[in-house]
Swiss-Prot record:
GO terms for molecular function: 4-hydroxy-tetrahydrodipicolinate synthase activity. Belongs to the DapA family. Its EC number is 4.3.3.7. It holds the Pfam family DHDPS. This is 4-hydroxy-tetrahydrodipicolinate synthase. It comes from Leptospira interrogans serogroup Icterohaemorrhagiae serovar Lai (strain 56601). It catalyses: L-aspartate 4-semialdehyde + pyruvate = (2S,4S)-4-hydroxy-2,3,4,5-tetrahydrodipicolinate + H2O + H(+). The active site is at Y145, K173. The record marks T56, Y119 as: Part of a proton relay during catalysis. The gene is dapA. Pyruvate binds at T57, V215. InterPro entries: Aldolase_TIM, DapA, DapA-like, Schiff_base-form_aldolases_AS, Schiff_base-form_aldolases_CS.
Length: 307
């Protein structure tokens, strides 16, 4: 379910449901748009709320600026308004993030995803000013993205509370893995912003404490299953949501046996959705007992009828 502007987490939120952090297929070191458009169609048919191109899972750090801009434009054209496009436009340079955001807005995205600045390790005040500046240059709603495991900085709930007063800041992808922090965040800003899980394995626990969805990696391969999990919970069918969660719990872990998106890219290749290419410094998934187990577990889920 997708809502229009002027909403909040308690009623009719702007961002809720399943947003797929979509992979970027490559062929001969160029974006493989034939495969990519088929992936988008798979997501639309599954009923996801939206896709997130140019994010971590989409290998944004190794996309050139022209590829980044083109991929967002092509995504908007391809989905034709059937689902939302929330474009990754983050950077550790505030100026660059603003430029990427302004370009994405002009190309017709529904929202932008802005990650914590990485490497330069700003203070909480620096984070506040960074995101405030980006939001002030955005014509669409902004989803903050807190992932300290990759950025080395943690966007604290108190800082998010300050940011919730900024007009375009409407949502947050929370990938700390800390349910305590997530609960505090929702208690502080839940009437102003939506909070979505940035970890597939915490989707159900976060829903239980007031979250409204997930920005998912696994939904690249199993979009319908993740939609069913979230919708079952929202409809009060808790047993059904729990069953899906536990059926996928091993995959949720194995999908991160190596750095994301290495495992999901391999999985998508195994099932014929893209080629095996991944850009350096990332390398193809190691062929070992764990990766063999990953493939076997995925095949088992397919045999159970999950899509």
């Amino acid at each position: 379910m997708i809502a229009k502007s002027g909403s909040n987490q308690e009623s009719n939120p702007m961002f809720q449901g399943v947003y797929t952090a979509i992979i970027t297929p490559f062929k001969n070191d160029k974006i493989d748009y034939d495969s990519y458009f088929k992936l988008l169609e798979k997501q639309i048919k599954a009923g996801v709320s939206g896709v997130v191109p140019c994010g971590t899972t989409g290998e944004s750090p190794t996309l050139s600026h022209s590829e980044h801009a083109e991929l967002i434009r092509e995504t908007v054209k391809a989905v034709q308004g059937k689902i939302q496009v929330v474009a990754g436009t983050g950077s550790n340079s505030t100026k660059e993030a603003i430029e990427l955001t302004e370009a994405a807005c002009k190309d017709g995205v529904d929202g932008i995803l802005s990650v914590n600045p990485y490497y330069n390790k700003p203070t909480q005040e620096g984070l506040f000013q960074h995101f405030k500046s980006i939001a002030e240059h955005s014509t669409v709603p902004v989803m903050l993205y807190n992932i300290p495991g990759r950025t080395s900085v943690n966007l604290l709930p108190e800082t998010v509370l300050r940011l919730s007063e900024v007009k375009q800041i409407r949502s947050m992808k929370e990938a700390t893995g800390d349910l305590g922090q997530m609960g505090k965040l929702i208690s502080l800003v839940g009437n102003k912003m939506t909070v979505l899980s940035g970890d597939d394995n915490l989707t159900l626990p976060l829903l239980a404490i007031g979250g409204v969805g997930v920005v998912s990696v696994i939904s690249n391969l199993f979009p319908k299953a993740l939609v069913q999990l979230v919708e079952s919970f929202q409809q009060g069918k808790i047993s059904e949501a729990k069953k899906i969660h536990y059926d996928f719990i091993e995959v949720f872990a194995l999908a991160f046996m190596e750095t994301n998106p290495i495992p999901i890219k391999a999985a998508m290749c195994w099932f014929g959705h893209c080629g095996p290419e991944i850009r350096l410094p990332l390398t193809p998934l190691s062929q070992n007992e764990t990766s063999s187990k990953f493939k076997k577990v995925l095949e088992g889920l397919k045999e159970k009828g999950y899509e």
